[in-house]
Amino acid sequence: MNSTDKLDSHTPMMQQYLRLKAQHPEILLFYRMGDFYELFYDDAKRASQLLDISLTKRGASAGEPIPMAGVPHHAVENYLAKLVQLGESVALCEQIGDPATSKGPVERKVVRIVTPGTITDEALLQERQDNLLAAIWQDARGFGYATLDISSGRFRVAEPADIETMAAELQRTNPAELLYPETFEQMSLIEQRHGLRRRPLWEFEPETARQQLNLQFGTRDLTGFGVEQAHQALRAAGCLLQYVKDTQRTSLPHIRGITMERQQDGIIMDAATRRNLELTQNLSGGSENTLAAILDRSVTAMGSRMLKRWLHMPTRDIKVLNNRQQAIGSLQDLYSDLQPSLRQVGDLERILARLALRSARPRDLARMRHAFQQLPDIHALLKGVETPYVQQLLSQVGQFDELQDLLERAVVEAPPVLVRDGGVIAPGYNSELDEWRALADGATDYLDRLEIREREKLGLDTLKVGFNGVHGYYIQVSRGQSHLVPIHYVRRQTLKNAERYIIPELKEYEDKVLTSKGKALAIEKGLYEELFDLLLPHLGDLQQSAAALAELDVLANLAERAETLNYACPTISEQPGVRITEGRHPVVEQVLSEPFISNPLSLSPQRRMLIITGPNMGGKSTYMRQTALIVLMAHIGSYVPASKAVIGPVDRIFTRVGAADDLASGRSTFMVEMTETANILHNATENSLVLMDEIGRGTSTYDGLSLAWACAENLASRIKAMTLFATHYFELTTLPEKMEGVVNVHLDALEHGDTIAFMHSVQDGAASKSYGLAVAALAGVPREVIKRARQKLRELEAISSHTATGTVDATQMTLLNEETSPAVEALEALDPDSLSPRQALEWIYRLKNMV
């Protein structure tokens, strides 16, 4: 589109379009024309590709045909949902003038901008997931990061000190839209994300940010929020708030404060740990078989979102954890009575956000009324519970009898979707509205009587009175009887099998009906806006109630999970260490067809590191992950899958397990593994829980072994972290002889001929064999390949037994001689745990070619 400069050469309507488009050059403009939203020029081309809609041409303007695409106004939400999922933003431009009185084009203006991070419409949002808008800032002192959930008003800021912490924050919050300054240097950190928005530098000005935030919260300064000195975070928050005001074009009364999130308040997890533990997303990007999938049976969407926030930010505040544990304990006998009432409360949090933005639909108000009707039952059910924390939450749930009464009087039982459809305000609420409705209804009755009268008077049995949007009211007579109509019948429309007529009397009543309907609808819209004015003064109390109800839902849900899944209440101790009796993996035990074998775990200052050996598929990774998940669950206040657990102070959880090539960044598996390892060695403390699985496997035998040895030594002697160290390097099993606090444990298996039975039970001491060939046989590797491998194994073991030194078991073919076969090096570097059956088979053929 080259013609924006020469506006005069365009038609008046296109001039209007181009002026509006110039104000929103970067985003799609949906331009309302009658029953359609139209897009023109490049917008039309882009939308036709993204939405798979027809690209046509509309006449010509400035001598050029105009590319055009359009969507019907009644289906616009579906198209917006698709665009938002693709990370696009859309400006909605409506007709605000009256076509009947307009000279020239009807007046239009952009009434809202829909962006991925600022949506509140039910149709566009994922119900059980937070939808965050975020802004990021970086300077020499570090990062500033702000997030806002506009559908709840939750506004958070943080100041990650380094790029690893910033990456972990992005992974945790997973914003739908991210604002960044045009000078942002670390593009590699964000460039893979959807919904990126480059913003001018002035939007991040610290003074402007302070003014914006103080104005929003009605405060003099930000000291009360604890963010006055958070200079980087405030820059991000200021840009974010400005963007929301620009896109929403209305006040934001539900955003009432800002909270600083400090890493030290919770258990810190880096991006790799969050991914590996599969908290809310599995390694394939789906949501099945995750911790959230097992733990989340919340009956409200707002409760589900709160639980996921807890999982991603476990707290270290012992008082909070004890409160939650006691509440869960006291709700175990009540959850079955409480959950049905909570389910009826629905997603009050998001309804209130739409109320605050004055975009609530009639059905939102009906749902709010329904939520208010549940509150007396919830109060009655919980008032006898003696746990102080449950009473504290209950005291935050208000009783809104007046508002309930207002909505019961004002809104019909089952309102239509939109106010413009009419019929939202209940009869008897407003006398003027009732009068106009009676007029409209009376006129309708009159038309029924007119039809009967004319049919009988003229003796035309096919005569009927009808209405359509183009021609208004008409009298229809079949073609066969049309020659019998009297002369004062004026033909209005001819159809294939009928003729339509108008008579003066009908025209008069048409005007009366349309006038009374239009008047009734105008009054109804005014009364609907008035309802917002009556509800909004109570917004603060309503939001507090919604938050308390969401938390009661999470706690009742965790009480149900604890009872159903046989979880025990962990003891949160201030003594260092982790002791678990009969621990189980919360996800694996639910997907296994056979009973899960529970296992103990003991870590203490005298027993800091477990060297874990045993066969592939023996359960090493499961054992390690279940430990991390039990510790994490204990730190959200939940009961845990064990018969007993005592959890001491934990500041961070690190996992270095099963890396894959990071093709996007051009990093090999080994490079990914070493980067994660470096992060652990730099940041772990004696209170950290560290899971190290098969360190050093992506390089040659000696490199890998030396790295694994040095890492284990460093973690055990310098850092003194609580470490689970799984390895196939059996040389590492000699570490306990050389260092205090290091202990061998193994997972056992029984071999019989070519078959193997994994015991999945953890025993003290080192494993005696790796059982790699038995696992290959299980994976379906052909018998002749297994046979040849056994033969080769015996040869290699013979070589190994001549050259082996120290206490290394000859059967482990550690091959300390210099003349190592490439096949053996490849075998050593291979991690069978991470192979699919097909990959295992490919490797066997590759190894055969090497030998």
Curated annotation (Swiss-Prot):
Keyword check for Zinc-finger: no
Keyword Nucleotide-binding (UniProt): yes
Binding sites annotated in the UniProt record for ATP: 614-621
Stretch forming the signal peptide: none
Cellular component, GO annotation: cytosol
Any one Pfam family match given in the protein's UniProt record, by short name: MutS_IV
Membership in a protein family: Belongs to the DNA mismatch repair MutS family.
Protein name: DNA mismatch repair protein MutS
Organism encoding this protein: Serratia proteamaculans (strain 568)
Underlying gene: mutS
